[in-house]
Structure formats: C-alpha cells, structure tokens
A protein has these predicted regions:
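Beta-sandwich/jelly-roll carbohydrate-recognition scaffolds of carbohydrate-active enzymes
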Residues: 2-152
C-alpha cells in the first residue's frame, strides 16, 4: 500500500498497482495538506467532497461540488459551485480545541479505501497541557443514495 508522504503525486497512477485498493498518509504535513485534500476526495458521481480535515486547518481548500452545477453563464471560465460545507466540525476537550494549529500532532494516519469508498482517519493530539486525545473518523459518499454523504467521528 503506497505511502504518499514518501512519493510525489507525479506518476501516482503508475505506482498504484491493480491489486492496491487504498492510498495512505502516515503523518500530517501542513505543506502537503492541500495535496492530500485532493487525493482523499470522496465522491459518487453526483457529488464530491475534498478530503479536508474535519476540524479544518489554516489554508485548507474545503469543498463539496455537485455534478452539473456551475457558476457562470456566457463567461470565459465556468466554475463548479461550492455546495454547503457538511464537514465543518469543532472538537473540544475540557475547553481546548483539538486541531493541528492548537495542538501537537503526535500520530496521524489516513487511508482512502477505494474498494469500499471510505475515507478513514486516526489522529492523536497532545494539547498544550500535555493531555493526549485520539480522534477517529470515517466518511463516504453513498452510491445507494447519491444524495447522501455520511461522517462518523
């Protein structure tokens, strides 16, 4: 299973063999976060949601896009319309916000399972007082009901 932190996105398709069904991220790197947001997109043909962190981070490019819905008419560049953000989530423990800006990321891993269409994440944060908290999430865009996206945290 390829670890994308160790590879460039150039030639990624060639690196993922036919037997490989997931891509992984083994640590959080703020400089590569937007690239991973693109790679960890979940979608079902009707809508797609970028693979941003649930709690957000500085510089993120969040977005949920609907197939066939565009902004612009008779203009040179037609853009996809950004639908409402259904991922935005604030996680607090004892009044301290858990995110990559406020806490130290002790462990972080994500995997996009292509076979099941699920994005999985596990992050361990250390807050400024040294307490450790593990955050896990799953998300998907349903093929059974293409209007449905779901997230479990």
């Amino acid at each position: 299973m390829p670890d994308l932190n160790e590879r460039s996105s150039v030639g990624l398709r060639d690196e993922l063999g036919a037997a490989e069904w997931q891509i992984t991220e083994s640590c959080f790197d703020a400089e590569k976060a937007n690239t991973f947001e693109t790679l960890f997109t979940v979608g079902n043909g009707r809508l797609g949601t970028r693979g941003t962190l649930e709690e957000g981070h500085v510089g993120e490019v969040s977005g949920t896009f609907l197939s066939g819905v565009y902004d612009g008419y008779r203009v040179p560049v037609i853009d996809l319309v950004n639908a409402p953000d259904w991922l935005s989530l604030g996680v607090f423990v004892n009044g301290v916000r858990l995110d990559v800006q406020s806490c130290t990321v002790v462990e972080h891993e994500r995997a996009l399972d292509f076979r099941h269409g699920v994005l999985w994440r596990r992050t361990v944060f250390a807050d400024p007082e040294g307490r450790r908290t593990q955050l896990e999430s799953l998300r998907f865009a349903s093929f059974a009901d293409r209007r449905l996206c779901a997230m479990r945290v």
